Amino acid sequence: RQRQMCIRDRIIAVVAAGGIAVPLSVHASAGELSHCLSVAGVRRLLLPSEMRSEGLDAVCEALGVEQLAVEDLPEPVPHALPLAGEQGALIVFTSGTTGKPKGVVHTVASISAMVTSLIEAWGWEATDVIPLFLPLHHVHGIVNILLCALWRGATVDLYARFDVEQVCQKVADDRYSVFMAVPTIYVKLMAYLKTLDDATRDQVTEGFANMRLNVSGSAACPVPL
């Protein structure tokens, strides 16, 4: 959870300061990081100090990328630069299933268009509460969930990773009004439900039924699911 909060805060801070944020996977190999850092023209890499490694140090040294430990950064300044619509804000890399990941540039205007259209389509309200366990280096997690919720003033419940037991407990307690996940998450949920006693299973399924919106995205949902 702390890591997700760190990524969330740094993305917003970089854009507010007039820069372009390039969120990257914490599980990326040195080769993958080298490719992404080089293609995006990254000059500074923000990360927790415990994530530094010899491999990453070598990549950054070769590319002239300065590493900054997030815990050593100065206190935030309550000031943001005016944002122009054509200004670059995010570079999000594709998954790389058909070749090397490609960096897609999103401007302030394009993000605004995406977020406002999704808010209207999905009926986001300030009273909504949604869990966020998807990675924040893909559009689904960053835009569809995080930015839509923050834009509308809704509440985001951050997870470091998907915890099926904890998520289902909160669902049973009617904590969430919106739920967005990928098909593999729904497969894990269905498998977990089969391990529960009838009463607990009914509470969880009722919690899902009480939500106003459930979304499966990022990949095609299998017909059996």
Where are the predicted features?
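Conserved AMP-binding/adenylation subdomain of ANL enzymes
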Residues: 112-129, 139-180, 188, 192-196
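Short, small-residue-biased leader/transition segments that mark boundaries at the very start
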Residues: 2-7
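Short hydrophobic alpha-helical segments of the AMP-binding
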Residues: 10-17, 21, 60, 111, ...
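Conserved pre-ATP/AMP-binding loop-to-beta segment of ANL
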Residues: 75-93, 100, 123-129
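Conserved ATP-dependent adenylate/AMP-binding module captured primarily in the ANL superfamily
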Residues: 26-56, 75, 114-131, 163-177
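Short beta-strand->loop structural element characteristic of the AMP-binding/adenylate-forming
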Residues: 11, 15-46, 102-105, 132-133, ...
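Conserved AMP-binding A3 loop
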Residues: 89-115
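Adenylate-forming
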Residues: 47-54, 160, 176-225
